[in-house]
From Swiss-Prot:
Pathway: Carbohydrate biosynthesis; gluconeogenesis
Gene3D superfamilies, per database record: 3.60.21.10
Keyword Manganese included in the entry's annotation: yes
Top enzyme category: hydrolase
Name this protein carries in UniProt: Fructose-1,6-bisphosphatase class 3
Reactions catalysed according to its record: beta-D-fructose 1,6-bisphosphate + H2O = beta-D-fructose 6-phosphate + phosphate
InterPro entries assigned: FBPtase_class3, Metallo-depent_PP-like
Length: 640
């Protein structure tokens, strides 16, 4: 028994009775129903769709409303749901449509509905937790109103008097907004983002700003997140890749406007050395309009950053033989006089290949001008306060994987051999496989983030390996064929052969083996993102007899034509796990004015035999440990 520990613990309580009260309180909490977890993945900068799914709780808010108000029509449910999703926008819309008296009556009626909804959704939480979910300035009055919302005639006048006074003071709208926010917070308790916040879509920064404000959230890093983290943390190679992808999808505003990164030097460089090429046409999502000059500039910038990326990658491949990336040293395979490249035993013609600054004798070498541009850009990335804040959030809330409430969350894969054995990755004569491999990567990511002044150390280079490496759990293919897709017409060179994991994950025994490696039993599930599920072709996101769920379904508009839907999410509550499929989101304006919602189709993945309690969760295990310590303290209180 650690006497000093228990003496410190005793100092937190005023008396022995206070210890007993805490034991009773924590024990009671352990018996409450498990709170709802919400899983999202591969949101790729699509803020409006992401924000809407957060606000509607993947359809769970409408479900709560139907349970709370069984007498309501579908139209009434939809109208009340919209008020909860977008309270300020809905109130503004109704205010414009209604006369003053009619609007005040609308507010009074809906305020009562929202009070009843809070009472309904909060019934599985302690009163303390519900109280803390209220804005502080409304805490007392809302608690009073909720307690009396269903009161009988004895206290009806008391309740009505409070409402009338609030109406006279003009507080109805503020209370409605506060209640709507509370309902959303209580309906979904915790959010998991299983990777890929960045790239393709226009607003990854707005997504992270939204996540920072959330009370309970975690992130499993995706490959697109890692490459941005690496760009901030000193990797010139990752930085070139980030700029190239932003140019490819017409999203330079993310860099220049959102993060305040000055691109003038590299834009001037691209204009000076490159001509537009068909393969580098920007891929613009529907609705984005650019002038011909703007498209040409993005085209040239994409070409310039691609060549700089290949130069820097060649340097990394040379200094990191452990990475076994020699087959990707593409600049050294080129016959510059013939404009051909030898890949393996085959020779291919290069189409529209421009390399005005490449020295055929030393293709990886940078010119003095390029060295200056890269140094300038690295400084600009490191100097962005907003990007710094976002990377720090990803570091604090993120990891390579998460084991939570019996489930394992990994963005991409766990590298395997064809026989199902864990594939090892050897660095500095140390082999890493399975969970140990992901722990190793996690450790190195944090080393890189701690030292952004380093650009060529092992930790920084491993950030790039996580983007392109065969044994990377975030990539898991033999090669990333960026060069081939740009310059070679023969599409067989574009194929990126996947790690056997992606076939073997259909087998329940393989998933059980992975779960066991991470200390989880066969009652758990593995959740992946990363690979879009092509539902329109009949692909099923539920695999391995329900042990594996893949939830990359196409939040990114660029992929929706391939997938046929606009994303999957998961809800895990005390009754089991539901998979939710979403249709494309239109606009907030349409959602408010017409009550349109992302159509959500739910499918039960796993139903529990007994309703899950808090004691069955990670939080519950912590509480049970605290209770055990408090029981020792209570029993020996006088001794300490």
């Amino acid at each position: 028994m650690d006497k000093k520990y228990y003496q410190l613990l005793k100092n937190q309580f005023s008396s022995k009775e206070a210890v007993l009260t805490e034991i009773i309180n924590l024990s009671a909490i352990c018996e409450l129903p498990k709170a709802t977890e919400h899983f999202m993945s591969d949101v790729h900068g699509e803020y409006d769709a992401f924000n809407h799914v957060l606000r509607n709780g993947s359809g769970s808010i409408k479900e709560k409303l139907r349970d709370c108000f069984p007498e309501f029509s579908a139209t009434e449910i939809s109208s009340l749901a919209t008020l909860i999703y977008y309270p300020q926008e809905k109130l503004d819309s109704e205010c414009q449509l209604k006369e003053t008296e009619e609007f005040e009556n609308y507010c009074r009626i809906n305020l009562v509905y929202l009070l009843k909804t809070v009472k309904f959704v909060g019934q599985k939480y302690t009163r303390s937790k519900v109280r803390k979910a209220f804005p502080e300035k409304f805490r007392y009055i809302l608690e009073e109103l909720i307690n009396e919302v269903d009161s009988t005639t004895d206290k009806r006048d008391y309740f009505d008097s409070i409402l009338s006074q609030l109406q006279n003071l003009g507080e109805f709208t503020r209370l409605i907004v506060a209640l709507a926010d509370t309902i959303r917070r209580l309906t979904v308790d915790h959010l998991h983002v299983v990777g890929d916040i960045y790239d393709r879509g226009p607003y990854p920064d707005k997504i992270i700003d939204r996540l920072i404000k959330m009370p309970s959230v975690d992130v499993q890093w995706g490959n697109h997140d890692i490459v941005w983290m690496a760009a901030f943390s000193g990797s010139p190679l990752a930085m070139m890749n980030v700029i190239r992808i932003c140019a490819r999808y017409g999203n330079l505003d993310i860099l220049e406007e959102s993060y305040g990164i000055n691109l003038r030097m590299i834009l001037e460089y691209a204009e000076r050395y490159y001509e537009p090429s068909e393969a580098f046409q920007p891929r613009l999502v529907e609705g984005v309009r650019l002038s011909d000059d703007e498209k040409a500039l993005l085209n040239k910038l994409q070409e310039a950053t691609a060549i700089l990326q290949f130069k820097l990658e060649s340097q990394l491949i040379k200094r990191r033989p452990d990475f076994q990336l020699e087959h990707r040293d593409v600049l050294h395979f080129i016959d510059f006089s013939e404009k051909t490249i030898k890949l393996g035993t085959e020779v291919y013609e290069l189409t529209d290949f421009q390399a005005p600054t490449v020295n055929p004798e030393q293709p990886e070498s940078l010119t003095a001008e390029e060295e200056k541009i890269i140094s300038h850009l690295l400084n600009n990335f490191r100097s962005s306060d907003k990007l710094k804040r976002h990377v720090e959030f990803l570091q604090e809330k993120g990891a390579m994987y998460l084991s939570y409430n019996g489930n394992l969350l990994i963005h991409g894969c766990l590298p395997l051999h064809e026989n199902g054995d864990f594939k090892s990755f050897t660095v500095n004569k140390e082999a890493h496989a399975g969970r140990d491999l992901l722990d190793f990567f996690d450790q190195e990511v944090r080393k890189c983030l701690a030292h952004p002044e380093n650009s060529t150390d092992l930790a920084t280079d491993l950030m790039w390996y996580l983007w392109v490496g065969e044994c990377s759990s975030l990539f898991g293919k033999t090669a990333m064929t960026t060069f081939e897709r740009y310059y070679i017409k023969d599409k067989k060179t574009h194929v990126e052969k996947k790690n056997p994991y992606y076939q073997l994950r259909e087998e329940a025994e393989i998933i059980r083996k992975i779960l066991e490696n991470f200390g989880l039993d066969e009652g758990g599930h593995l959740v992946n993102g990363h690979t879009p599920i092509k539902e329109k072709n009949g692909e099923n996101p539920i695999k391995a007899d329900g042990k594996l769920i893949v939830i990359d379904g196409g939040f990114a508009k660029a992929y929706q034509k391939e997938t046929g839907i606009a994303g999957y999410t998961i809800l895990y509550n005390s009754f089991g796990i539901q998979l939710v499929a979403h249709q494309p989101f239109s606009t907030v304006k349409e959602a408010v004015e017409k009550g349109t919602d992302i159509i959500s189709l739910k499918c039960l993945v796993a139903e529990v035999d007994q309703r899950k309690r808090v004691k069955d969760t990670n939080v519950g295990q912590t509480l049970l440990s605290e209770i055990a310590d408090l029981e020792v303290l209570f029993e020996h209180y006088e001794e300490f």
